[in-house]
A protein has these predicted regions:
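Conserved catalytic core of nucleotide polymerization and phosphodiester-bond processing enzymes
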Residues: 1-282
């Protein structure tokens, strides 16, 4: 537990479902974007996007579920587990035992059917990376992303202009089923990506979405500090500041948090805020 200094209070906010929103935006999943925009405008429980996802999973009319419906949890876990080509194993990380494998397989199939643009993105970004490695120097575009091989790196340029660099990329596999591998230091030392199995559409998509979400958080941090809110910590997509008692408001904090950068004007962004004498994540 973290306590504010005497005479001070903590104020914080976190983005709402930011990866789901960014994924829908990058892919151009129109119904999902409309669902978030509608909910942000109305805050009607029947418009809650995880409820809408659940309606599509169970093939019932929109508005059939609310935030109190148990089916909403299925919609939420589907979004968390399946957005990057995940299946049963990904599901089990979020919900270990309530449903059978056959039920989870059906959820996955229904989720993919209801998200055609996201499915298309997985394969498009994988193909774009492969073309960029084969044809070094060529800029290959995939939606708002630009990919290029240069100087021993595969460079994935995000909408913000920031680049994610993948060292020593190469194409491996037979002519019909090639994929890109690169050196990965995620474990603290450079090894072949995924033990030599290489990258795939879900991995590229996760990197893109996480990178964009990071850029949104970084720009929000700069705005918030410039407005006089000193940041004391951030956890995932949450920012926490310590301010003198009576300074600022959660309403202003949210406005600062969700202000859209010029490169993401069509991305629906929302946040929730809190204030109090102590911070406890649990």
């Amino acid at each position: 537990m973290i306590n504010a200094a005497p005479g001070h209070t903590l104020i914080g906010a976190d983005f709402s479902a930011i990866e789901s929103r960014v994924l829908a935006w990058v892919a151009g999943e129109a119904w999902k974007l409309d669902s978030y925009r509608r909910f942000d405008a109305t805050h009607d429980p029947a418009d809650e996007p995880y409820c809408e996802t659940a309606c599509r999973i169970f093939r019932v009319p929109s508005g059939s579920y609310t935030k109190d419906s148990p089916e909403r949890a299925v919609g939420k876990v589907c979004d968390l587990a399946f957005g990057y080509m995940g299946g049963i194993n990904a599901w089990r990380k979020f919900e270990p035992g309530r449903f059978t494998d056959d039920e989870v397989k059906k959820f996955c199939s229904e989720w993919r059917t209801s998200h055609p643009a996201i499915r298309k993105l997985w394969y498009a970004v994988d193909r774009a990376a492969l073309v960029a490695v084969r044809e070094r120097g060529r800029v290959v575009r995939c939606g708002p992303i630009a990919i290029k091989s240069a100087g021993g790196f595969l460079l994935l340029k995000l909408p913000s202009g920031r680049k994610i660099s993948y060292p020593l990329p190469r194409a491996v596999g037979d002519a019909e089923r090639q994929h890109v591998t690169f050196l990965d230091n995620a474990a603290g030392q450079f090894t072949e990506c995924r033990g030599g199995h290489g990258a795939y559409g879900g991995l590229w998509t996760e990197n893109v979405v996480s990178g964009i979400a990071r850029d949104l958080l970084a720009e929000a941090m700069l705005r918030i500090e410039a407005a006089g809110y000193p940041i004391v910590l951030h956890v995932h997509d949450e920012i926490v500041c310590e301010v003198p008692e009576g300074f600022g408001s959660t309403e202003e904090f949210i406005r600062l948090m969700i202000r859209k950068p010029a490169w993401a004007l069509e991305l629906p962004i929302a946040a929730s805020a809190w204030s109090g004498p102590r911070y406890c994540k649990g």
